[in-house]
Amino acid sequence: MEISGLVSPETLFELDVEHPATGKPVGIKVMLRSAGSEEAMKVVRRQTDGILARQQKRKVMTAEAIEENEIDQAVSYVASWDWGENTYQGETPKADAATVKRILQKEPWLYSAIVNGARDIANFTKS
């Protein structure tokens, strides 16, 4: 079997967001990038450069900074989203980075769904 090209990290995966308690679709669809995509890796490289620079200055990473890095990685996984008839605080959220970040910081269940979807290599594997 030819294994080159088996995983395609640059393709998008449509995540149908499920209710955290019932597992039923809520009507939000998120187009996810793979955690291994170039866009996501740019964020990881930038963060790693920052961590290395801090270490050279003997500065310690705070828990808040580490959490911020994790959220920023999750934001990089979101290529777009469609909220259908759903709203967030009375509005249909746009998929710009600031809005995605704000929502993921406040909604850990949605953050988890996005991270799990982006990091599941099966979602980006050709069958």
Predicted regions and their residues:
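A general structural signal for short secondary-structure junctions and capping/turn motifs
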Residues: 4-6, 20-23, 67-68
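Short, surface-exposed, charged amphipathic helix/loop patches that serve as local interaction elements
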Residues: 24-127
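Short, intrinsically disordered N-terminal pre-domain segments
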Residues: 1-11
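Surface-exposed beta-strand edges and flanking loops
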Residues: 5, 17-19, 30-34
